[in-house]
Every structure is written in structure tokens, then in C-alpha cells.
Amino acid sequence: MGNEPNYGFFAMLDRMQYIARWGLMRNSKTENIKEHSFDVAVIAQCLALMYNRNNNNEGSLQVDPYKVACLGLYHDCTEILTGDLPTPIKYRNKEITRAYKEVESEAARTLVNLLPEELSDEYLSLLDPQFKGEEGAVTKRLVKAADKIAAYIKCIREESSGNKEFLSAKETLRESITALDVPEADEFMRIYVPAFGYNLDQLNGNG
């Protein structure tokens, strides 16, 4: 390597596959944050497309579905350095939440330092986004909703495999998704989520 700069950013992102989610739960199949991030990105993009369709009057705000998807894809990258802190702990009180946000921001800066300087600001805006204005607020809500829907789908997978460990988490997530009051999330849950409980024949229309 000699004196070459250490541009290990993408190699570090690859290590997301080693960070397991649901660490306090008995899993029939372990899920890592790399897998989860893909699910969140796919769902977030769909929610953004739904949002734009539902708000297509002249002068209405439109969000960038690809930016929303990208923010979903990168939303957990800092956990490479921080680990996956269980949600009940992360949001136990405002002090813990605020402190953890600071840790996440520092982790984001540490990661982008593994990039050439000309790229660092672009990636910092993905790893530690500052959701400003109306568009920022909508984008944040959509990504948060996608994150919870992806977690809910994980619970369905576990339930389908006969694991009852996730039943309580599933109910809690369902309530929290409803409480977000994001119409697009409710629509996604109604139209697309039931199929995650189907077997292959049912998905192919043979069941």
C-alpha cells in the first residue's frame, strides 16, 4: 500500500453483512443490516412514487423517489461502527436518543473520511442527512415508514417459519406504522404486505 490514501469506504460498507439485527430475539433466519437496507430502499422508493401520485395537483410538493430510495439504502450504514442498538433502548428517553444521534453523526464523519475529499460531502448527506424544509420532512417520514414496514415484513417471515418470538414485535410495529399517519405506508401495507405471507405457489397465482 505504501503511502497511498486509505479509501476503504466501500469495503467498510460491505461489512454491513456482519451486523445482525434483532440481536435480543431468537431468529429462525438471521437478518443483517445490509439485507434490511435493501428492503428499506425498495419500499421507500415505492412510498415516494405513491406520495407523488397522491399529491399531483399543480403546486404540490413532489419528492425525488431515487433520492428517497438512496437515503433508505444508506440509513443504517453508521451501525458498522455503532452496532445495532435495540429500538427500545435507543428511544427510551430524549437524552439517550439525542446522545445516540450524536454518536451516529460522528460515525458518519468517520466513514466519509475514508473517501476522497471531493466525494465526502455527497456521502455525508446520505449517511447523516439534514432533513430541511417541507421536502426534507416528507422524505424523513417516508424513509422512517419504510424502515418500520421492512421490520414488520421480517416479523411476517419469522411467523411464517413457525417462530412465535416475533408476534409481539409484529403487533407493536403495526401500531407504530398506523401512528405515523403516512397514507402511503397504510396503502403499501394494505396492497403489498399480505403477499409476504404467501408461499411460492400462491405468489405465482397457483394457490
Regions found by a protein language model. Give the residues of each.
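Alpha-helical, largely C-terminal catalytic domains
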Residues: M1-G207
